[in-house]
């Protein structure tokens, strides 16, 4: 499949590991130029960059807290200096909140809102003027299954908020040659932070409820992101792509 992505500039937030890393590698195979960001582990981010460079991609890495509008603006300006602009934005940075609703704190709520909604808001505002000027752009956000079937009020709220945000941008900027879509991954085989669900519990739940009884793979999500960004998907906007092994149907 000819993606038409050669030479495009991709900005991926939360790119140090897991789906972010897999997405970066998928774009590296398409001869794109890549800007990778994370707010914490520069070492892991540099490892992702090195893997992309081995595939022939030109890569730059930056520490960026997506909840800080000034840092986001500086990151996009750095991308302009290095590569001339940003053609594709992948809002992969996320913050998850686990546990019963009444055991969560207001700080948990605000943190989830900041990363999952403020982050895409700031990054989109920073890249859209350049996309409008060039008449071409792709913005890809991350929602999740909880937005559609429940499963944690805080998580469901922010993930459904991403869907609304995506649709609003798609409606407004389609006339400028910009598509905006979101992805709702199911249970993906990733390195999990301490305190999140135990792997064995997740595997049992997936095996019991999912028609394709296994975890999804980060590379499968990365391949979907590349497709959504490609010329082949130029007439698709405002949609949420569910990649969940059939865990639920839309």
Where do the model's predicted regions map?
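A glycine/serine/threonine-rich, flexible loop-to-helix segment
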Residues: 1, 46-50, 175, 182-210, ...
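Conserved glycine-rich cofactor-binding loop
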Residues: 16-18
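Conserved glycine-rich Rossmann-like NAD(P)H-binding loop of the short-chain dehydrogenase/reductase
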Residues: 32-45
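Substrate-binding pocket helix/loop in short-chain dehydrogenase/reductase
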Residues: 100-101, 108-113, 202-206
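Active-site helix of classical SDR
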Residues: 124, 158-159, 166
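Alpha-helical segment proximal to the catalytic Tyr-Lys
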Residues: 129, 171-175, 234
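Short C-terminal tail/terminal secondary-structure segment
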Residues: 212, 225-226, 237-250
């Amino acid at each position: 499949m000819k993606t038409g992505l050669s030479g495009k500039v991709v900005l991926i937030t939360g790119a140090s590991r897991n789906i972010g890393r897999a997405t970066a590698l998928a774009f590296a195979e398409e001869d794109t130029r890549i800007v990778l960001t994370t707010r914490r582990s520069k070492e892991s981010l540099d490892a992702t960059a090195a893997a992309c460079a081995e595939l022939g991609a030109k890569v730059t890495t930056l520490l960026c807290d997506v909840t800080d509008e000034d840092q986001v603006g500086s990151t996009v300006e750095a991308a302009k200096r290095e590569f001339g602009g940003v053609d594709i934005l992948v809002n992969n940075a996320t913050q998850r909140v686990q546990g019963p609703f009444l055991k969560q704190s207001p700080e948990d709520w605000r943190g989830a809102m900041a990363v999952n909604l403020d982050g895409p808001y700031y990054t989109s505002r920073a890249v859209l003027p350049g996309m409008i000027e060039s008449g071409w752009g792709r913005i890809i956000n991350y929602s999740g299954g909880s937005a559609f079937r429940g499963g944690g009020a805080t998580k469901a709220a922010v993930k459904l908020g991403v869907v609304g945000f995506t649709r609003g941008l798609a409606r407004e900027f389609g006339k400028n040659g910009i598509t905006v879509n979101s992805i709702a991954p199911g249970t993906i085989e990733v390195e999990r932070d301490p305190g999140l669900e135990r792997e064995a519990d997740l595997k049992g739940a997936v095996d019991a409820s999912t028609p394709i009884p296994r975890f999804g793979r980060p590379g499968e999500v990365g391949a979907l992101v590349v497709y959504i960004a490609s010329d082949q998907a130029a007439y698709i906007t405002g949609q949420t792509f569910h990649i969940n092994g059939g865990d639920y149907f839309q």
